[in-house]
Amino acid sequence: LKDGYPTNSKGCKISGCLPGENKFCLNECQ
């Protein structure tokens, strides 16, 4: 967990695809 959100192997938040994630991270959590 990072900042209370689960993250994927890239360290991107995967809970709700929050604003501020880069395009790659958004694709990861769709």
From Swiss-Prot:
Keywords assigned by UniProt?
A: Ion channel impairing toxin, Neurotoxin, Secreted, Toxin, Voltage-gated sodium channel impairing toxin
Q: Which organism is it from?
A: Babycurus centrurimorphus (East African scorpion)
State the source organism's domain of life.
Answer: Eukaryota
User: Which classification does the entry list for the species?
Assistant: Eukaryota, Metazoa, Ecdysozoa, Arthropoda, Chelicerata
> Which family is annotated?
Belongs to the long (4 C-C) scorpion toxin superfamily. Sodium channel inhibitor family.
Tissue specificity: Expressed by the venom gland.
CC terms in the record's Gene Ontology section: extracellular region
Could you tell me what this protein does? Answer: Binds to sodium channels (Nav) and inhibits both the activation and inactivation of the activated channels, thereby blocking neuronal transmission.
Q: Where in the cell is it found?
A: Secreted
Keyword Secreted on this protein?
yes
Cited InterPro entries: LCN-type_CS_alpha_beta_dom, Scorpion_toxin-like_sf, Scorpion_toxinL/defensin
Domain LCN-type CS-alpha/beta, first and last residues per copy? 2-30
UniProt cross-references to Gene3D superfamilies, sorted A to Z: Knottin, scorpion toxin-like
Q: What is its main location?
A: secreted
* Domain-related comment: Has the structural arrangement of an alpha-helix connected to antiparallel beta-sheets by disulfide bonds (CS-alpha/beta).
- What name appears for this protein in its UniProt entry? Babycurus-toxin 1
Q: Name one GO molecular function term.
A: sodium channel inhibitor activity
